[in-house]
From Swiss-Prot:
Keywords: ATP-binding, Chaperone, Nucleotide-binding, Phosphoprotein, Stress response. This is Chaperone protein DnaK. Induction: By stress conditions e.g. heat shock. HAMAP family: DnaK. The gene is dnaK. InterPro entries: ATPase_NBD, Chaperone_DnaK, Heat_shock_70_CS, HSP70_C_sf, HSP70_peptide-bd_sf, Hsp_70_fam. Pfam families: HSP70 (PF00012). Acts as a chaperone.
Amino acid sequence: MGRIIGIDLGTTNSCVSIMEGNTPRVIENSEGARTTPSIVAYQEDGEVLVGASAKRQAVTNPKNTLYAVKRLIGRKFTEKEVQKDIGLMPYSIVPADNGDAWIEVRGKKLSAQQVSADILRKMKKTAEDYLGEPVTEAVITVPAYFNDAQRQATKDAGRIAGLDVKRIINEPTAAALAFGLDKQEKGDRKIAVYDLGGGTFDISIIEIADVDGEKQFEVLSTNGDTFLGGEDFDQRIIDFIIDEFKKDSGVNLKNDVLALQRLKEAAEKAKIELSNSAQTDINLPYITADASGPKHLNIKMTRAKLESLVEELIERTIAPCRVAVKDAGVSVGDIHDVILVGGMTRMPKVQEKVKEFFGKEPRKDVNPDEAVAVGAAIQGQVLSGDRSDVLLLDVTPLSLGIETMGGVMTKMIKKNTTIPTKFAQTFSTAEDNQPAVTIKVFQGEREIASGNKALGEFNLEGIPPASRGTPQIEVSFDIDANGILHVGAKDKGTGKENKITIKANSGLTEAEIQQMVKDAELNAEDDKKKVEFVQAKNSAEAMVHSVKKSLGEYGDKLDAGEKAKIEAAIKDMEEALKSDDKAAIEAKNAALMEASQKLGEKMYADMQSSQAAGGDAGAAAGAEHAQAKPAADDNVVDAEVKEVKKG
């Protein structure tokens, strides 16, 4: 089995980690950063940019630069959270044929899974570059409060990216693994993981116990809000700036996508700066223009103002904390440590609110940006069999059940049940001679089924005629370690059964996933060709530059015919460089190398004679001559010979 990497697929930033022995290592990306912006840009020429390069060009390409796509994954277009985002995002969110929320980019519809796969592919490549070997297996984290559809969609994104997702684990649980593994305190400890990221909020109460030398991490409860995070904080700042600018200039920036993209960057920057200073300037020259000329934006913002804008958002995190503590069967005083995860927890007001609720200072020895990826890597090591001193007992975040007579939700597995788990219950028919039953599966806490998230439905057919209440239909629920649900129904009288892995009544079909995997592989082939073309072009341009330089220095030593031949080869090469034809560039490059061979010989002979002439010119020249001697060796590179100066 190869190495299993740990990936934190975040709303705003993503991170990848690997275990080296028993030490986790967060891997720097190609730009040298330990986290990668979860931003994907689709260029006109078909190139896909991911991370910092996508972020840099967002202002000039707002409609085709996608961020915070995690907020759409596994969601229906009609959900109120999606409808809210439609009015805020510069890119186009559209309904897919199956009812999911997809994104339209350059006339093409993309699922949130495909866009997430582009980010995962970047994480995979980051790990491969570091390890120097292919990576095919990963543990990917999701918010603890993600429902079944969102978990399944994340797993599908991994498949599209070419990864075998060995486990989906909850972000707070991963952070607890990263925190608790190296702690030497004896006895059981209860910790609260408060995870406020770019798009989601989770709170988990976790017990870390030493059981016969094994660290056992048991999730006691979890709660949260999958549509609350840093993006919402940014939006409050953007709305404030728009209102202030409208008051000052009379211009409304709400419908100007270029201005909105600049405002988003400025809001994020101001939010970060105000975590460390009491005031910041938001300065955006030439933000827009009207008949009177260009307009400049300059607004001072204090930390107090920011806190007043986002106070209600921070307050919204406290109710889930209260529920999680109650569901865990503990009191706030029983909690030993509070861990903060997610970039938003750097905000002083957030830390203050957490301290106020839990009655203790949150721990400062956990990196909020990296802990989740580190925990995923630890779980990867456990799954690969390289570690046996860790046991992770996670829970299902929401109750699961089926719709029964009168539209009631009959709960089969209650929220915060440790997974994996199985449960079966016997039901009967509602009408006489009913030939089939439809099993409708829901996830949520409402008593009426329609108030919960519909996960899917299937039929059990061929029930023999009988009066209502006679047939015995056993419905079984089985949640695997990824938190993904499998449901079965069996007629006890006939032995007939039907089983499905619940895929949301939206979600991607197997055929769609296969097609997306194929598309991704084709893109990878295109990317490879692009890189090879760029390398050929760079090599040819370097050759032209080198030969031109040498021709200027030694051209007078060649006869006219040879010189003309080289000049013609240079001209051919320059013409080829104007095209996108890699084969032509390589052919002309080879021709130029051949044509300039005589020039190389003249240069070499000239150097030899100048070195011989300088042979008696004292110790310094002798030393230079000694250094130059290896040039006679067959392994000498042309470029190195050219660097030797004439005596």
